[in-house]
């Protein structure tokens, strides 16, 4: 067994492995004898099948299993001897030029290792903390949003405008041909909710029910569907149905629809304020987290195993496909992990750095943190106690929460060391959303 440090990238390693053919054959013989009493072959009584026939039928399979196990054992011994932390699954390449005449099976294992990470000095991190006071204006804006969420829709003859619900057929053509995800029938969407690309939505605005139009638009260069990203596409849209929103009045019935059983409007406003404060606190925390995470990436520079990047990119692509399917779109077969390589590299790199930070400073999860996390999460539901009981009814559910708390512990540790600068923001700035990338 030889180990080599030669590598085509800083994290790649090669190990030369040698497994004795005699050792393989001996173990194969032992296993075939153990298997023989269980083998059933027509013409022979159970347990009386000759070993030669057992070997003819199962020898190759057993040899493959034995060689694989011995090879994996040798590989494990080699990486332990070198103190390698293997990332992903190794690849094994046969090195036998004449397998029949060889006294041993020769293989080269190629794999990547996790990088050594030096965290360095993290005390110089500076973050801007959003500051927002909740007043009547913020409560009223939230009320308006809640009314829009509970709007009913009625057909209208006027031109389409933001806030309307439209039902459309659309067909997209690229170089005279259709493309995956570029067509749909009776697709309903509310204009202005961020579910459509801006150029696509702006072409619907001003249309009337029954109208059909054709227009050209260019997909963003970073659009997930690589077949159309950055390309000019021709779309034909037919507006089948146009409906205008009708907002509910702010009265006792509206309060009851928000879970205020008595229909007390003042109590409703108080609950809105409490919920709004909780959401604002979460958003502020998210903003702080984004900044300290970026600071970590800027300050701790490491190499990342390519195999981990590829795994994460493929996972993100599958996640996108499932998301499209859940919204009624057909899966885009052209969507591959290649589109997500940059995002995947960032996520993997950040995950490795966070793991090092958590281990170095022993940022373990405490039972009271789990309880606090679940209780805060449950406040967003109508029956918090039921949500809490549901989580504690399953150890697996509690286990799923631990990574979130570990990450939060890391953020808290970094914020304790960071310089925090208060920065006033508006309600719209803090609560705003970005446009989605759907067609």
Curated annotation (Swiss-Prot):
EC number, UniProt record: 5.2.1.8
Ranges of residues in domain PPIase FKBP-type: 163-248
UniProt entry keywords in alphabetical sequence: Cell cycle, Cell division, Chaperone, Cytoplasm, Isomerase, Rotamase
Subcellular location: Cytoplasm
Annotated Pfam families: FKBP_C (PF00254), Trigger_C (PF05698), Trigger_N (PF05697)
Superkingdom classification of source: Bacteria
GO CC list: cytoplasm
GO terms for biological process, alphabetical: 'de novo' cotranslational protein folding; cell division; chaperone-mediated protein folding; protein transport; protein unfolding
Catalytic reaction equation(s): [protein]-peptidylproline (omega=180) = [protein]-peptidylproline (omega=0)
Matching InterPro entries: PPIase_dom_sf, PPIase_FKBP_dom, Trig_fac, Trigger_fac_C, Trigger_fac_C_sf, Trigger_fac_ribosome-bd_bac, Trigger_fac_ribosome-bd_sf, Trigger_fact/SurA_dom_sf
Presence of the UniProt keyword Isomerase in the record: yes
GO molecular function annotation: peptidyl-prolyl cis-trans isomerase activity; protein folding chaperone; ribosome binding
Written domain comment of the UniProt record: Consists of 3 domains; the N-terminus binds the ribosome, the middle domain has PPIase activity, while the C-terminus has intrinsic chaperone activity on its own.
Role noted for this protein: Involved in protein export. Acts as a chaperone by maintaining the newly synthesized protein in an open conformation. Functions as a peptidyl-prolyl cis-trans isomerase.
Stated family: Belongs to the FKBP-type PPIase family. Tig subfamily.
Name used for this protein in its record: Trigger factor
Originating organism: Nitrosomonas europaea (strain ATCC 19718 / CIP 103999 / KCTC 2705 / NBRC 14298)
Organism lineage: Bacteria, Pseudomonadati, Pseudomonadota, Betaproteobacteria, Nitrosomonadales
